[in-house]
Every structure is written in structure tokens, then in C-alpha cells.
């Protein structure tokens, strides 16, 4: 038997646990103050309108709903992006962010059969799985500094500088998973310059746009690469979190070409790759996202709802740090400096095991916790348990 997915396996154990007051800090889902997955008002308005219209659900084109692809381009690259004006971006709706990664990986494997893929150490577990399954050799570049609970930026630059030209570099645009440690704009500028100098191929994964500072600020890495003069790069993005549409599997793959003609050729290759995989994406989730982003009024409402989610996560980080400090554990202050849904808590596997066994609190063995799963009702429970295993 193949080894099970650690996150899915942990979720199964959590569901089977009958203890009251259990808390799941392992799975990557945003929950509201009631511990529920929210249904956003902007999404609900589009869904209700769709239900009233009663449109049939035919197959979408291979690259998805045109309105969805166009709205994605504006959100990811910026509405005034020169790349969009020049027609240099080929975008396809995909089955979630994972689907975007796999379609992109399959396409690049055919185009660059001798290239390697470099991912951050650590990275989201599925990054290595996806690119390995596509046939790539995957290598690591330095990223997280366990001693400072921050970014090992000198190590990152050193490792990127050693990569062979043509290497595909997987970069997290914002809200790094699993660490929550991000680059500053100034650091991104240095990375962009180095990637360009070394002739590396950037593959940017943006699954959490809007969960740190806002939709535009969180796309800074994409915008910097777009302005850099680099001929080609790849972006995979997901709406699972930002639209709270986890089960709808709404993602997109965008590939920048050197010219309009190259982008058109790339789009043809992407469609061929999709056709041999799942033929076309699902209708419902894409229509919801396109409906929200295509309405000025609903776009404003969605941005405000996204801001509420973002601010609640910030508040949970601050509350956790404050309550731990009150128990003499000021060393956890770094949690407040991290961004997005996740935190590399610094807890050891032994401490994580104790949280599960003694307190019915579930987390990943690496110490990653989902801050978005905290709320006012369970925060004290979690803090007291973390304090107990930390002393």
C-alpha cells in the first residue's frame, strides 16, 4: 500500500474522535466564528440568480468559461496590465489550484524534458507530489529558518543562484504554505532579478490571494515578474479559499508568452493537455466566480467579505500570541508576524502528538497549524493546551 496523505489521514482520525471540544487545526479550510465554512453573500446572490434563470448545464469549452478566464487575468495581473493589453497571457479554467499545477506540470514536462523543478523547503506537500508525478526531478531551495521562525533569505538567494538555467522555480506568491513566512516587496525584487539573470522559469502558486494584505498587494510577486521583462512565466491560482468554494474546484492556469502569437500557441497546447486529462472544467463554480468578479457591485461586496476573513485571522493570531505571552510564553510572538491561514508554530512532533492524545487538538506533525480554524470559542482551549505541552 502507498503511504496515506498526512492531512487527509489526520482528518479521518479527527472525525472518528468522539471526545467533546475537539479542535482540528490541521486541515486548510477557513472557518468563521461559529466554526463553519462560510457561504459568502456575494456568491449566494449569484447562485440565487442562476437558480432563477434555470440555465442548462452543458459542457464548457476545454479552457473553461471565457468570462471566468478574463476575470482571472484582471484579478491576477491587474486590470491595466500591459501583458493583457498585448494579449500575452493564456488563461484556462482548471479543476482547482491542484489541477492548474498538474496541467502546467504536464505541459512543461513535454516542453522542458531535461529541466528540474525547485520548490521551497518546506513547501505544500502536494507540490512535490504533483511535479514528481509529472516526471520531474524535484529539488529544494532554502526558505524557512527554524531558529528565527522567519525567512532564510540569504540561503534562498544562494540556492536559487546555483540552479541550472531552465530550471522551473515554484514560488508561493503570498501566505506561504506551510510556514506563513512571506517575502517583502524588496526581497521579491531581488528574487525577480536573480531569476531573470539565471534564466530560470518562474511558476507562481497563488492559492491565498487576499488573505494577507489584499488582492492587489498579495499579487505583488506576479506584478513584479510581469514588469520585469521576463518573456515567460506561469501562474496557478485558486478561488477555493477566497470565495469559500472548496468543493467546487475553481482554479486557473495562466501562462505568459513572449508575444501574442506565442500565447496563442501555448493556449492550444494547454487545451490539448486538458483534453487528454479531464476534457473540460466544471460549470457551476466557474459561473459563480465569474458572476461575482464580473459585477462591480458584487466585486465590492466580495472584497469586503474577504477583508472580514483576513481581519479575523489577524485577530486570532494576535489573540493567540497575547494569551500565550500571559502564560509566560512570549517566545511565540513570531506567530503574529506570519501571514495567511497557516503558521509554522514551532511545535515538535512529540508536542503535536500530546495535543492530539491529551487534549483532542489535531495538527500536522510538522507543527503547522491552521490559524483560520481558531475562534473565540476554542482559542483558550488551544492556548491552554499549547502552554501545557510547551512547559
For the regions a protein language model found, what residue spans apply to each?
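N-terminal "arm"/small-domain region of PLP-dependent enzymes with the aminotransferase-like
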Residues: 1-67, 71-74, 78, 276, ...
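Active-site PLP attachment segment
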Residues: 220-265, 269
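Structural signature of PLP-dependent enzymes
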Residues: 267-286, 292-321
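Hydrophobic "anchor" residues on beta-strands that sit immediately upstream
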Residues: 168, 201, 233-234
